[in-house]
């Protein structure tokens, strides 16, 4: 906003995270600070457990099996193979997914993203400045950016299997950009857990409520599908250095739009969307970018 309004000539957005020098219990406790303290974390509920409750309810409401979520993880790992900055460079199969160690039923190890260290940065300048500098790279512009909030406590929401803040932030971003879900060529979503992939796709209009797993099972989220997601591995396989994740997503959108995504390059990508989630959906921001 500062650059767009003319208040500043340029700005840098930097995300940094260092998570490998703490004990797992300390890291879990720190992350849980973004959850409700009075009714959730005071009883020892972690983010894994919160997402497990949401996923269990989703399976019950819509009749899916846990194994129907395997394509989300398989897709992320496949895309990470060609990303030199990814945390996990190993393909997985449905059998691997089924045999993975359970963490908080129904979430297993391959439903969850790995935390880690990381840093990412983007430089934002007015479009006119890029032109006058004569840079050879393709110009990528921000055409929509919006945030929305929901209750911190998951149990206070009208429906725990619906990300209302994702829906609202996407609606506002679509309105600013003058586009809709049909014009989005790819989506860098916040797949901290596989259930969040499904909920984000539905809230942002890429699938009807309860139908995101079908999108994944039909291979429509792959690099050649109708709505590619997590094109460089996502949080699940690129990794989730929490403080840097949102900027990583923007960098990856820019790489795709500039044609710099290497073996994962999408054909003809012009408009990309990134969405980052805070807590279990209490704060969500959506950005839409376009290449000229």
Region roles according to the model:
Residues 29-31, 39-106:
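Glycine-rich, mobile lid/loop segments that gate access to catalytic sites or pores
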Residues 58-63, 132, 169-183:
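Phosphate/pyrophosphate-binding loops at sites that engage ATP/ADP/AMP, CoA/4′-phosphopantetheine
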Residues 3-5, 26-36, 128-129, 203-210, ...:
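A glycine- and small-aliphatic-rich helix-loop capping segment at beta-alpha/alpha-beta transitions
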Residues 1-41:
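A generic, well-ordered mixed alpha/beta core segment in the N-terminal half of proteins
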Residues 67-68, 180-185, 208-209:
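Short acidic capping loops at alpha-helix termini that bridge into adjacent secondary structure
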Residues 37, 41, 71, 102-168, ...:
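Condensing-enzyme catalytic core mediating Claisen C-C bond formation in acyl metabolism
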Residues 1-17, 49-82, 122-128, 238-261:
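Active-site-proximal alpha-helical scaffold in enzymes
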Residues 154-159, 191-214, 225, 241-243, ...:
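Short glycine/threonine-rich loop-to-helix capping motif typified by GTGT followed
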């Amino acid at each position: 906003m500062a650059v767009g309004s003319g208040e500043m000539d340029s700005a840098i957005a930097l995300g940094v995270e260092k998570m490998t020098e703490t004990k797992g219990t300390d890291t879990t406790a720190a992350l849980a600070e973004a959850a409700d303290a009075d009714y959730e974390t005071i009883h020892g509920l972690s983010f894994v457990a919160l997402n497990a409750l949401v996923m269990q309810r989703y399976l019950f409401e819509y009749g899916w099996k846990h194994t129907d979520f395997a394509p989300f993880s398989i897709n992320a790992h496949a895309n990470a193979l060609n990303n030199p900055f990814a945390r996990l460079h190993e393909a997985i199969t449905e059998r691997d997914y089924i045999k993975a160690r359970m963490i908080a039923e129904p979430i297993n190890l391959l439903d969850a993203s790995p935390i880690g260290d990381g840093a990412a940065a983007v430089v934002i300048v007015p479009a006119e400045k890029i032109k006058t500098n004569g840079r050879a790279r393709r110009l990528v512009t921000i055409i929509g950016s919006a945030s929305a909030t929901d209750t911190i406590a998951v149990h206070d929401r009208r429906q725990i299997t619906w990300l209302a803040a994702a829906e609202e932030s996407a609606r506002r971003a679509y309105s600013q950009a003058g586009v809709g879900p049909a014009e989005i060529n790819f989506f860098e979503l916040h797949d901290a857990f596989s259930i969040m992939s499904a909920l984000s796709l539905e809230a942002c209009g890429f699938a009807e409520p309860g139908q995101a797993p079908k999108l994944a099972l039909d291979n429509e989220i792959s690099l050649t599908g109708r709505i590619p997601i997590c094109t460089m591995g996502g949080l699940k396989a690129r990794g989730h250095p929490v403080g840097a994740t949102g900027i990583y997503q923007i960098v990856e959108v820019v790489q795709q739009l500039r044609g710099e995504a290497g073996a994962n390059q999408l054909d003809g990508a012009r408009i990309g969307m990134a969405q980052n989630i805070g807590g279990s959906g209490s704060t969500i921001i959506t950005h839409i970018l376009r290449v000229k």
